[in-house]
Amino acid sequence: MRVSRVTPFLADLGSGKNLCFVKVETDGGPHGWGECYTQADRDTSIVALVEAIGRYLVGRDAGHITHFVHWAYHDFAAKRGAMDFWSAVSGLEQALWDIAGKRHRVPVHELLGGPCRDRVRVYANGWYGGAKTPGEYAARARDTVGRGFDALKFDPFPGPWRTHITRAAEEQAVANVAAVREAVGAEVDLLIEVHRRLAPMHAVRIAREMERFRPFLYEEPVSSSNLEALAECRRQIAIPVVTGEELYTRAEFRRVFELRAADIVNPDVCNCGGILELRAIAQMAEPSLVTVSPHNYNSTTVGLAATLHVSAAIPNFLITEYFVNFEARGREIATPPFEVKAGHIAVPVRPGLGIELDESALARFPARASTGRAMPTPGDEAP
């Protein structure tokens, strides 16, 4: 069964960035869907790479998934990967797994050794958009818990993202966390997102202030581009530290485990190299007693489906990400939609990834040329 066509779809589903889906067709067999991670205003380069790599994928056996990733990196990219490249590869790799599952009439997790669980715990993200004050964070948190979520992730810091911030910014972040904890009670897990922004001096001081609110985790307090600094931060605080969303493939995760720089890793199936690579990273983490919380700043459709299958198949899974603000549009473009019940999603049981996209629905959401973001001026910078 050989690949006959590769088609990327770029769509603006109102998520603040364009989303990139990939359809891989075969000569007389099933087709497959994948999703590539994107960032705001960094999507057309990923589409271009999908098209360029796709030209070499056409004519090849759709079942040769491991070899596809091997030659894409070693030969197409000449061993020079980056976010855009690995995002393109990840989407294509997922589509090949979707084809494999459909071909063998089993869900993808059965091809990964079978499930370790029948449902996957998720935390809500995207629920606090526009919140600036503690009261606004608290109100949005109560609403989200009212929808059935028992874990909330949020970035409590004022912008812009900077390595060194003022005491006032530190205090505002702590106040926002305090307000959310008071609003939702002690039983809801709070996941604190830092977005790689801080130097250890800030990250440690803030974490110690937040410890009394019992955060579930502290995500990327320091960039993984400086793992020694991240490890320094981890050693000084009592909140589990997460890293991984800016790392790609096993090669980049190796030193996380060697340095014991994190308690939890959060690779993203849409940019870490795909389904097999996410599982391989989880397997590396397990003997180091590190758990896995897959990042999923993707749609609630294909990217989520791929995440669910890997999450089902790895023993050291913890929790994964679900963007509540992507949910409504996701239901318009995909069938069947995933349902969150009591903070969990049932592991898909249909063949392949277990989800199909509607191309006519995607056409109703053309991509935006630019998000029109406001970039900071010198006057926006802290002293």
Indicate where each model-derived feature is located:
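Shared catalytic-loop signature of beta/alpha-barrel
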Residues: 44, 48-53, 67, 208, ...
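Metal- or metallocofactor-binding catalytic centers and their adjacent structured scaffolds
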Residues: 27-103
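Flexible C-terminal active-site loop/helix
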Residues: 4, 8-14, 27, 299-383
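N-terminal metal-binding scaffold of metallo-dependent hydrolase/deaminase domains
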Residues: 1-25, 33-38
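Glycine-rich, aromatic-flanked loop segments that form ligand/cofactor-binding clefts
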Residues: 93-130
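Conserved, mostly hydrophobic/aromatic
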Residues: 3, 29, 53, 92, ...
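Metal-dependent enolase-superfamily TIM-barrel catalytic cores that perform enediolate-based chemistry
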Residues: 119, 125-232, 236-237
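Glycine-rich phosphate/pyrophosphate-binding beta-alpha loops
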Residues: 10-13, 35-43, 89, 125-129, ...
